[in-house]
Amino acid sequence: MLVAAFAAAGEEVEGNPTYPILPHLGELIVGIIFAIIIYAVIAKKVVPRLEAMYEERRAAIEGNVEKAEKAQAEAQVALEQYKAQLADARGEANRIREEARQQGAQILAEMREQAQAESERITTAARATIEAERVQATAQLRAEVGRLATDLAGRIVGESLQDSARQSGVVDRFLADLERSESGASSR
């Protein structure tokens, strides 16, 4: 139906019907030539630029992907190094802690030894001082008892015991008798 409408609208030129939407042969040839020229210009100028832009974009995307993969690999290596360093640091901290604990125990043991030695030294010195004071007190007591005994014995006996040898013999005999009487009284 459409063809019939075109045929009715067209005029007949030299026995051929003309169609209004069909171009003339000259126009058709000029159109084909311009189409070929436009195609050639596009193929020579535009397409290479588009291809270059496409290639640049593809290379940039691939480069970015490679960079991202490389960065991820580096991050993984850094993470492994960090974990290794962290493990080393923990091991070092444990070693230092254990070393400090051992040093503390050693210092404590040394301090105990020093305190024990000081205690023994003080105890020994105190015992020596006490013994020296006891010996001195005993000597003073013997001398005092001897002097008193000599005075009393001299009064009782009526003779003078001023001679030191005699005095010493009397004192020793008196103390021996006194010790015997005390030991006899304590055994009862």
UniProtKB/Swiss-Prot annotation:
* Record GO terms (molecular function): proton-transporting ATP synthase activity, rotational mechanism; proton-transporting ATPase activity, rotational mechanism
Q: How does it sit in the membrane?
A: Single-pass membrane protein
Record keywords: ATP synthesis, Cell membrane, CF(0), Hydrogen ion transport, Ion transport, Membrane, Transmembrane, Transmembrane helix, Transport
Q: Does the keyword Chloroplast apply?
A: no
Superkingdom, natural source: Bacteria
- Alphabetical list of Pfam families matching this protein: ATP-synt_B (PF00430)
Q: Which parts of the chain are coiled coil? A: none
Q: Which InterPro entries match?
A: ATP_synth_B-like_membr_sf, ATP_synth_b/b'su_bac/chlpt, ATP_synth_F0_bsu_bac, ATP_synthase_B_chain
Mind telling me which GO cellular component terms the entry cites? plasma membrane; proton-transporting ATP synthase complex
Q: Transport: present as a keyword of the record?
A: yes
Which family is this sequence assigned to? Belongs to the ATPase B chain family.
Assembly and oligomerization: F-type ATPases have 2 components, F(1) - the catalytic core - and F(0) - the membrane proton channel. F(1) has five subunits: alpha(3), beta(3), gamma(1), delta(1), epsilon(1). F(0) has three main subunits: a(1), b(2) and c(10-14). The alpha and beta chains form an alternating ring which encloses part of the gamma chain. F(1) is attached to F(0) by a central stalk formed by the gamma and epsilon chains, while a peripheral stalk is formed by the delta and b chains.
Task: Note the NCBIfam families from the entry.
Answer: ATP_synt_b, PRK05759.1-3
Q: What does this protein do?
A: F(1)F(0) ATP synthase produces ATP from ADP in the presence of a proton or sodium gradient. F-type ATPases consist of two structural domains, F(1) containing the extramembraneous catalytic core and F(0) containing the membrane proton channel, linked together by a central stalk and a peripheral stalk. During catalysis, ATP synthesis in the catalytic domain of F(1) is coupled via a rotary mechanism of the central stalk subunits to proton translocation.
HAMAP family in the record = ATP_synth_b_bprime
Q: Quote the protein name from its UniProt record.
A: ATP synthase subunit b
**Mind giving the lineage of the organism this protein is from?**
Bacteria, Bacillati, Actinomycetota, Actinomycetes, Kineosporiales
Please name the gene that encodes this protein: atpF
